[in-house]
Amino acid sequence: MEDAKLNVIVLGNDPQYIQKFRSALASVQTATSKRTAIQTVSKLLLVKAEDVFACNFDEECHLWNMRMVDGTEYKLKKQTTAKMILGISPYFAQIRQDRIINLEYLASIENYTLRCTFSPPFDQEEAFISRRCYKAVKEKLEIL
């Protein structure tokens, strides 16, 4: 029965495609449930990717700030780079040089202004994607 469901999703009955689908699904499930240790300025923080809403670079302090879904903010260690943050989850995308968002909370992107809207409780947040980062963000999304 399980294989029949997979056949419909994969649009074929080739066992090779079914196995590829299973391994892709397993990697996505692992990526979303995995906890990552992140060094803040005051402690070692263990977080799941879905608990992170966004990261912003503070020009004044030259530190990345990680904003959690519950609203708490953590200042990350000075050596933390955007590349390190993006490596936490495939759902993280850099929308500007100083901002990284979790695509799980992205609801839409306006075509011309590149204004982002987010799903609740972040529907009041305002963010814009830079033209430079837009292509990379689109590549991470499954666009029909």
Question: Which ranges hold each PLM region?
Answer:
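C-terminal catalytic core of Y-nucleophile DNA break-rejoin enzymes
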Residues: 124-127
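Structured alpha-helical
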Residues: 135
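Short, charged, intrinsically disordered terminal tails
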Residues: 142-144
